[in-house]
């Protein structure tokens, strides 16, 4: 018969901060953990830990629903989304809900529905969280062995990993289904300035999809962040979804190999550190994606990227001065290079001036003016459309630069608008959170390894200075 470790709440791999092993209670004396390490009390109480996780999910979903409705209530259809401090509606718009040609919002009802659905879901999760935290069984091993676990049980842990991977794979396929069958998604590259369309011709070629992973991360290459058509993005989700589901099935059906059993630490704190490390990587990648990529994060909703705003400024003044009679092909700038156009070191024609550093920008309002050797002079003279001028002028004055007190835009741009771009918020927040998660990964990895090696003692709580101080109250 399997030993029920849950009946012995404390076992050697998990490290206590003092030697007390008495059961029950919520204080330091009975649990071995001070108030600030409250989660640690639940390490071996699978039922209570389930309650904590479900309640946490409820809080997250409640925030999503409430914030969603808050943004709907404050939304002004006449202004671009990125001028209104919105961080949720741009995601819904990118999925093709409520928008039409050019990214114009034609119906806010889907956004309202999204908010209400999240609020209802959060109530269900909140009830489940409170039930499992207060009323449900403390441990699940005895009554519900399928949901029970012991942190040291390697086979059960990889089964749980497999279930999580399958759920992630299903999530990836939900986006694929939305793009293929349920109204499509917003494509910023659709002719004439973007539109919602169904993705019919998926990119499934492994050489293309995995080619992104093999690219250099630097300018002109840009690793996976350089993806710039929806066929590749949705095709990539097919691959990711399939790999997650197959990998999840594999982890459910197999037991860890001997090398994995030896190499990894098998404790709750170790799994926490692995998870934090993975989330940290996701955060850093998301930061780069939202900052540089204007296909997955269309500029119509998130505002222009930094390079895009800079190139838009060069384009706007090229249009203006060309109308005033300047010969933009040969005009010389203050450094002796071309004032409006110049050649890059590899020979293609790019915008001149300081924006030359952003030569590798690709944007839907600019690409129609390129030829085989970069910007095409005859197209710049004859083919510029009014929507391209309007969009670049708008992006020029909405650079994603700014501070928390909303002094946004380029410091030298007299037409800049006081706003902070959602791109700035999303990139900065994901970088900062990614960094903190990385620090948490190092902290918990160090503790888990030390505990596994048997020399983690923690701080001696019996002689802590605070214990001899006068109570605050």
Swiss-Prot record:
Where does it reside? Plastid, Chloroplast thylakoid membrane
Q: GO CC: one term? A: chloroplast thylakoid membrane
Query: Could you give a single Gene Ontology term from the biological process aspect?
Result: photosynthetic electron transport in photosystem II
> PTM N-acetylthreonine: at which residues?
15
| Alphabetic keyword roster | Acetylation, Chlorophyll, Chloroplast, Chromophore, Manganese, Membrane, Metal-binding, Phosphoprotein, Photosynthesis, Photosystem II, Plastid, Thylakoid, Transmembrane, Transmembrane helix
Q: What residues form the membrane-spanning segments? A: 69-93, 134-155, 178-200, 255-275, 291-312, 447-471
Q: Which Pfam families match?
A: PSII
Q: Explain how, and how many, cofactor molecules are bound.
A: Binds multiple chlorophylls and provides some of the ligands for the Ca-4Mn-5O cluster of the oxygen-evolving complex. It may also provide a ligand for a Cl- that is required for oxygen evolution. PSII binds additional chlorophylls, carotenoids and specific lipids.
Propeptide feature ranges: 1-14
Instruction: List residues binding [CaMn4O5] cluster.
Output: 367
Give the record's membrane topology: Multi-pass membrane protein
Which InterPro entries does the record cross-reference, listed alphabetically?
PS_antenna-like, PS_II_antenna-like_sf, PSII_PsbC, PSII_PsbC_sf
User: Subunit structure, per the record?
Assistant: PSII is composed of 1 copy each of membrane proteins PsbA, PsbB, PsbC, PsbD, PsbE, PsbF, PsbH, PsbI, PsbJ, PsbK, PsbL, PsbM, PsbT, PsbX, PsbY, PsbZ, Psb30/Ycf12, at least 3 peripheral proteins of the oxygen-evolving complex and a large number of cofactors. It forms dimeric complexes.
Q: What does this protein do?
A: One of the components of the core complex of photosystem II (PSII). It binds chlorophyll and helps catalyze the primary light-induced photochemical processes of PSII. PSII is a light-driven water:plastoquinone oxidoreductase, using light energy to abstract electrons from H(2)O, generating O(2) and a proton gradient subsequently used for ATP formation.
Q: Report the sequence similarity comment from the record.
A: Belongs to the PsbB/PsbC family. PsbC subfamily.
Name of the protein described by the UniProt record: Photosystem II CP43 reaction center protein
Organism of origin: Illicium oligandrum
Its lineage reads: Eukaryota, Viridiplantae, Streptophyta, Embryophyta, Tracheophyta
